[in-house]
Amino acid sequence: MDLNKCIGCQTCTVACKTQWTNRNGREYMYWNNVETYPGTGYPKNWMELGGGFDAAGDLQAGIVPNIEADYGVPWDYNHDELQFGAQLKPNVEPTWGPNWDEDEGTGDFPNDNYFFYIPRICNHCTNPGCLSACPRDAIFKREQDGVVLVDLDRCQGYRYCIAGCPYKKIYFNPKISKSEKCILCFPRIEKGLPPACAQQCVGRIRFVGFLDDEEGQVYKLVHKYKVALPLRSDYGTQPNVYYVPPTEAPPKFDAEGRVIPGSDRIPTEELEKLFGPEVHKAMQTLRAEKEKRRATGKSELMDILIAYKHEDMFRLDQNYYQSIAKKQGISLAPIDNRYMAGKNTENKYKFKVVEYD
């Protein structure tokens, strides 16, 4: 994900929400969300809720966020009552919700204020904290592509997975008392199509492919040029979503409103907190390649990031998935109630539903 091109339009969020999480106990979930940084994020203060692994590789204790206080309870607009009913004084004050602090920057305007957007999905980690925390072995990582999924037949809703995930990108469905998460739109990628969030991104910030595909743009951004970095790699989960750090902020102004040449409006210590010490080299490479493009008109890296052709951003070989399915004797993306939350749950699930006030 190229953070220099994200405009915070939430089209990716809407694409995911309308496809996966607008019904059946998932209403409060945002498998994809776009956060304003610096900000509290979603769920609230997720970076402070624990989980992940320490330097010795031991799973760290984490906190399960509260649905109402930390995620925000979704609502339906009562359009008919508002439009045709009696005029009443509102008696409910909103207290929290996704993107509560959207577009709220920090610093002093206009000298050094800033913010930028961070789109977040499940990182489909190589060493998932959610998987390690689950006592039911209900979370598994697919061998063919590394997608991390929840087996809803095995899940008992203990929520250890939520505590174990340092990114808090796995959620509890109170309707079926089970945990659910981003599935990277695997029915789409098995057909050679990108996830809905990536397909609908108007800023063309999302590249999707295999890390070992040396001809792919993901490989070139992560391994060849090393300008795409994982978010909070210090959590020890080896996340597989990579970010090109923001370098396009204007310089700072001094007290008289004059430009301070060479100044960074976004503090480098904040970027290092998010993306680790390698962010300095990544930013140097990005700036050097940009100058190279200006001077010579040529830069493979800049061409990749500009993303002239939408289809070039996604390298998902349908034939690969078909060969795997044939070898294993399975059908691709079967219609399976395990991935249809709330469907026929009256007979399928016998677990207690947690009620929230």
Predicted regions and their residues:
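Non-ligating segments of multi-cofactor redox enzymes
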Residues: 1-357
